[in-house]
């Protein structure tokens, strides 16, 4: 539901990403939430009356993540806007793709298949303007049979912030969790074009990127927080400095927690 313009309410949240200035989804007392199984009420938390509840994706019923608030970009919506206006119901197609059609793992590949049946196809235009500048790091590929083509780009001057609502909605619909605009755009393009992508923090790269097979017993903590023991057949993307290289991600599968 919506709130009257100018109406102020006090809500207590212990979420890890709760901070001043962010936009959140607010459920007022009496609201029934699909991911909570009960009505929201007023509660007293540490002596402060909380008039409602700021919501995580799980509580709102749009995703599995329940450890933090659903976070909107600054000025995405005027405070008090009913969420249904910005987050309409989705229709999601769940498709099983056979291994011989990796092109159909992306939206564009599916659209091309439908185009062959007579449906209209509008190819998305690439608005990116890239300059051929020297990179501040190197690239080495030790396992060309596993990565015959590896492309690196370099972006600077970025402001890390929540993604636009339309992109967050698309990622949630595809079963992914929005993180921030930098991570989300790589996942969005991956879903669109079936091309695995990852954004690396330059601080973790060192002298450059090394694509190699994992060493026996090598371990990697992935983005989902799981510590994994790697197999020598696993292809890893590592940051290297001198003779040492540390895995930053499992190629084509998942990035590392520190990457």
What are these model-derived regions, one by one?
Residues 1-259:
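RNA/tRNA-interacting regions in translation and RNA-turnover enzymes
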């Amino acid at each position: 539901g919506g709130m009257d313009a100018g109406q102020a309410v006090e809500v207590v949240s212990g979420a890890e990403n709760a901070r001043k200035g962010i936009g959140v989804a607010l459920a007022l007392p009496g609201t029934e939430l699909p991911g909570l199984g009960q009505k929201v009420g007023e509660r007293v938390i540490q002596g402060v009356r909380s008039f409602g509840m700021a919501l995580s994706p799980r509580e709102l019923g749009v995703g599995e993540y329940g450890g933090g608030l659903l976070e909107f970009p600054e000025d995405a919506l005027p405070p008090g806007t009913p969420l249904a206006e910005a987050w309409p119901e989705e229709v999601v197609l769940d498709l099983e793709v056979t291994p011989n059609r990796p092109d159909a793992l992306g939206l564009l590949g599916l659209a091309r298949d439908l185009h062959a049946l007579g449906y209209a196809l509008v190819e998305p235009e690439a608005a990116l303007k890239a300059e051929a500048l020297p990179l501040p790091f190197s690239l080495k590929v030790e396992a060309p049979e596993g990565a015959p083509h590896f492309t690196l780009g370099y972006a600077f001057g970025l402001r890390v912030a929540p993604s636009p609502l339309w992109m967050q909605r698309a990622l949630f619909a595809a079963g992914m969790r929005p993180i921030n605009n930098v991570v989300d755009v790589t996942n969005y393009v991956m879903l669109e074009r079936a091309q695995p992508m990852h954004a690396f923090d330059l601080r973790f790269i060192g002298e450059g990127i090394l694509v190699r097979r994992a060493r026996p017993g090598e371990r990697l903590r992935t983005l989902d927080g799981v510590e994994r023991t790697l197999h020598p057949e696993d292809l890893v993307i590592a940051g290297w400095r001198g003779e040492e290289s540390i895995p930053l991600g499992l190629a084509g599968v998942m990035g590392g927690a520190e990457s």
